[in-house]
Curated annotation (Swiss-Prot):
Matches recorded under InterPro entries: Ku70 (IPR006165), Ku70/Ku80_beta-barrel_dom (IPR006164), Ku70_bridge/pillars_dom_sf (IPR027388), KU70_core_dom (IPR047087), Ku_C (IPR005160), Ku_N (IPR005161), SAP_dom (IPR003034), SAP_dom_sf (IPR036361)
Chief place of localization: nucleus
SAP domain ranges (all copies): 610-644
Organism: Coccidioides immitis (strain RS) (Valley fever fungus)
Protein task: Single-stranded DNA-dependent ATP-dependent helicase. Involved in non-homologous end joining (NHEJ) DNA double strand break repair. DNA-binding is sequence-independent but has a high affinity to nicks in double-stranded DNA and to the ends of duplex DNA. Binds to naturally occurring chromosomal ends, and therefore provides chromosomal end protection. Required also for telomere recombination to repair telomeric ends in the absence of telomerase. KU70, of the KU70/KU80 heterodimer, binds to the stem loop of TLC1, the RNA component of telomerase. Involved in telomere maintenance.
Ku domain: residues covered: 282-472
Annotated GO MF terms: ATP binding; ATP hydrolysis activity; damaged DNA binding; DNA helicase activity; double-stranded DNA binding; telomeric DNA binding
Compositional bias (Acidic residues): 11-21
Start-end of Basic and acidic residues biased regions: 1-10, 579-598
Descriptive protein name: ATP-dependent DNA helicase II subunit 1
Length: 647
């Protein structure tokens, strides 16, 4: 039974050596913004649709984008690194100890405004000052008179990633520019930039381009950047693979550019969480491939990762220490003195740590296929827990991708699923699960929403399945249904689809907003923004008349229902029955009760819910059919089932 799983947190102090931490993989991310500073990037784009909005330049919008992303990461991903590199500036700065370069490696016209590191409150405030303070921006955002070498920019980024994030699994370089051909007249510099881009790719850094088109010129990536940007391999699930889209500034102000950049970056900034890596998927004896598992869908909730002490001048993280103390003597108990016992027959039976481990050991982590069943045999109510998405990994066994793809396509073609024995990691409780094939899902822009792969859906235990209570619903009449259909049609969401990205969790966002204000030493917000509140004015405008018509129809149908009910009471008194008639009436009631009890027992027998009947009803039924009514409830149920089986 799923509810009977023991609490592993209570045993954590005695199983520290045995817990397999490699089963959960957290991918830290390092993002470096490379924003070009040029005359065109500093020119504010006019907004003909809004006269009140202040025009903003693409460079300012990109800096705002970096600022907002830094705000988000300081709360949601506190271990990720973010940096801002300005190139094409008149002044140069690489590190604080050397304004013009680092040792013998000069990077002219490259200004490292924010070093690649975990963002602190001072970094966020400094970047915000650059965006809002015009004097500060006029001091730094000065375009150089001579062109900057893209090879130097990429080599500078290479040095930053190598120095600050050498072991990060995800490293990305965001280039924001409106120049689609920076070295149109110099093939040597273009070739050097291509070589530096290849070096970044070999280092594991993914270059992402945010091209900005102008009203007079569309950004053409084929002139220069197609040779620099390497797309990720489709067989690598942890390598980002995004389509490059152009962001036009024509007819839009800096806020529109910012929103466009933020939506594109937010789709890339979701951290990858691997529940397990290189887990064997056993298709048969001595036939295994390796897969990795990801939890794609999960409800987010505020989680405490540590305790913070706010009593001093600065907040400090509390280091917790667990100490076990004996109740009788209050002395500290050593780890080797601890024994765990279970109560059997009124006595406590103690087990050693080795015996405890042997009891919980169900074998090595594995996904073992037991058999195959048609998808029609998997009911929708069998989904009781979060499903795990699995994808092939070549790290464990070479050729896993080909075998995995063949299995997935075959299951899709034959409309079947695999029944598997699933042990996620060491010391984990095994479960019977359904291995369901999944197709790739794309949105209207042909962007991938759900990747192709397979899903592990844990199946419920027998004790998890409950019998639904009997409900007698009143079906609404057709006129009332027709009126409600009109209301639903006018209130339908765009394209009839719910987009969770448009409705963030208000309580979670409020929690993050408070933490952000505390971390950045800002004023606490007065009110939370809740996008889940219905738009009552818009609802009334669209469906107000239809709702009133539905209410009138509801009253009409209610009157018809009340008028159709039979009269169940009268004012006339009945004469007192004679003793003979009273005896006959009692006999009639007894016969009716027995017949009603038989019908009820038969109904529960057909539904398989005899255990819902009381012992009294079961005994009366058995005695009325000359059967024994002694024994426990289970024995009575068995006799009732045997009685109906013989019929």
């Amino acid at each position: 039974m799923a509810e009977s799983e023991y609490n592993r947190e209570d045993d954590s102090f005695e199983e520290e050596e045995e817990v397999d931490d490699s089963g959960y993989k957290s991918v830290k991310d390092a993002v470096l913004f490379a924003i070009e500073v040029s005359e065109s990037m500093l020119t504010a784009a006019p907004n003909p649709t809004s006269k009140k909005a202040r025009p903003e330049s693409p460079a300012t919008a990109a800096l705002k984008c970096a600022y907002h992303l830094m705000q988000q990461r300081i709360i949601s991903n506190p271990k990720d690194m973010i940096g801002v590199l300005l190139y094409g500036t008149e002044s140069s700065k690489f590190y604080d100890d050397d304004e013009d370069g680092r040792g013998s490696l000069p990077y002219p016209h490259c200004y490292l405004f924010t070093d690649l590191d975990v963002p602190a409150a001072s970094d966020v405030k400094e970047l915000h000052a650059l965006v809002e303070d015009e004097d500060r921006a006029a001091e730094i955002l000065v375009p150089s008179k001579e062109p900057v070498s893209m090879a130097n920019v990429l080599f500078c980024a290479n040095q930053i990633f190598t120095t600050k994030a050498p072991n990060f699994s995800s490293r990305r370089l965001f280039i924001v520019t409106d120049n689609d051909n920076p070295h149109s007249k110099d093939k040597v510099l273009k070739s050097a930039a291509t070589v530096r881009a290849k070096d970044l790719y070999d280092l594991g850094v993914v270059i992402e381009l945010f091209p900005i088109s102008t009203p007079d010129h569309d950004f053409d990536t084929s002139k220069f950047y197609d040779d620099m940007i390497y797309r990720a391999s489709p067989t690598d699930p942890e390598a980002p693979n995004y389509s490059c889209t152009s962001t036009k500034t024509s007819g839009a102000d800096g806020i529109s550019i910012l929103n466009s950049l933020l939506s594109s970056i937010n789709s890339k900034s979701v951290p990858r969480r691997a529940l397990f890596s290189n887990l064997p998927l056993e298709l048969g004896p001595e036939f295994r491939i390796s897969v990795s598992g990801f939890l794609i869908f999960k409800r987010q909730a505020p989680a405490r990762s540590c305790y913070v002490w706010l009593g001093g001048e600065q907040p400090q993280i509390v280091k917790g220490v667990t100490t076990l103390v004996a109740d009788d003597s209050a002395r500290e108990v050593e780890k080797w003195e601890i024994r765990k016992a279970y109560k059997f027959g009124g006595e406590h039976v103690a087990f050693t740590q080795e015996e405890q481990s042997a009891l919980r050991n169900f074998g090595d982590p594995v996904i073992r296929i037991i058999g195959f069943k048609p998808m029609s045999s998997l009911p929708i109510w069998a989904s009781t827990k979060h499903s795990t998405f699995i994808y092939p990994s070549e790290a464990g066994f070479v050729g896993s991708t080909r075998v995995f793809s063949a299995l997935q396509q075959t299951l899709l073609k034959q409309k079947k699923f695999a029944l598997v024995w699933f042990v996620a990691r060491k010391n984990a409780a095994p479960v019977m699960a359904a291995l369901i094939p999944g197709e790739e899902k794309l949105d209207d822009n042909d962007a991938q929403v759900i990747p192709p792969g397979m899903w592990i859906q844990p199946l419920p235990f027998a004790d998890d399945i409950r019998q639904n209570p009997e409900t007698h619903n009143i079906v609404a009449p057709e006129p009332l249904i027709d009126k409600m259909r009109e209301i639903i049609q006018v209130l339908q969401l765009p394209k009839g689809r719910y987009d969770p990205q448009r409705y963030p969790n208000p309580s979670l966002q409020w929690h993050y907003r408070i933490l952000q204000a505390l971390a950045l030493d800002e004023d606490l917000p007065d009110q939370a923004e809740d996008k889940t509140i219905p738009k009552y004015k818009q609802i009334d405008k669209r469906a107000g008349e239809h709702v009133l018509e539905w209410g009138e129809e509801l009253e009409t149908q209610n009157r018809l229902l009340e008028n159709s009910k039979p009269i169940t009471s009268t004012l006339a008194k009945r004469p007192a029955p004679s003793r003979k008639a009273e005896g006959d009436e009692r006999a009639t009631k007894r016969v009716r009760a027995e017949s009603t009890g038989d019908a009820e027992v038969k109904m529960h027998y057909e539904k398989g819910s005899l255990n819902k009947l009381t012992v009294t009803i079961l005994k009366d039924f058995l005695l009325s059919h000359n059967l024994s009514g002694t024994g426990k409830k289970a024995d009575l149920i068995d006799r009732v089932e045997e009685f109906f089986d013989r019929k």
